[in-house]
């Protein structure tokens, strides 16, 4: 995760101990109903959404890592819930398209 953070020039917002972990797959979406269809665990969710539903969806979908794009800011409630569920949140100024492209070209695999 620390390499992913570097690639997108990201900033960790919580659960920084998870930066030592590795993730093999990523999924980019602003549509949380699509995220809930995923049958995988341990993936990076790349999104531009910043609401509490994002954290609820990540928890249900077993996505322990979130990348917020376009410089979006997490609310205090989001950060509290992320800490409670041990979900690492990163933030980047890059767009969702650019972030996903950079990560894919650097070896992050697509779920499908």
Model-derived features: positions:
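Short secondary-structure junctions
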Residues: 10-16, 110
